[in-house]
């Protein structure tokens, strides 16, 4: 249910009115209060899942939700205070539940603590809201649900964009020019640790690789990999960064962040992806967070090694994907110590790079094709599973 209409569309709940809302909601979540359109509506349309939209000035249907899309969870904001009083009356009476939809993977325990405190301030039962999170730990929490948002997000960017099928790399049998692809647009210290070590050890000579200089305020003291355990690594890493940015394509900075833009040769001319995920430990939550970075490799016919949260491969298996366990060492995924997981992942990489890349790719081919087909398929069942969890 929504408070406002915009032509024939609902206007996102709690969002300030844009200068030209009749054109597009693009960029809505980029500024305070970081409210964004609820992506679920787009996904329901993409995959033909039934979704009834109504407004708070109409009769409230049974089991109705009031969706609030979050581009970023801001702990300084009292989200409940932003809800119109007439809508809040329905929530207080139990006729309507708030549904926070958050596609990011930061710590959901902290978000629950904040929202439960706000419930107490406003005299609301904690059962007045549900929270959808991109962090897998959400499934272990009361009133929280995990949803693989980025799988469906990249589907609508990589499979079918604005009603048109998108190009993608194929699992061809021809020799390829590079062993692997490893891309990083945004600088984070843990990513710099990994890529600089590849660089120092001469592992990038047969790779498509990049390391950008876009910064988001990441602090070296927050690096989840303990640099003190590697003599001289920090100084060599800083030297590596001073030579950047490093590029492997001709795309602009804007195109690098446009998920429907594909430099196809980075996948069709290399054998696998070493994925530098968005988060490495998901704010000590114990959960995993999988983004389009991983799904881009899957869609474009690449097997993968993932530098990311523990449990990332396990989550992919739970989603139905194959993680090439018969063809490379994937035991790193179960290691919770961030530094040890980094060491074990590097060991798996080095073992893989000793193999005949072409022969190894052919061994993986059936699983590559299986994963690609699974990703391209309808996500109706994903949405149905989410609806089922929210109805409990």
Describe the residue ranges of each PLM region:
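Pol beta-like nucleotidyltransferase catalytic core
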Residues: 1-275, 281-291, 295-392
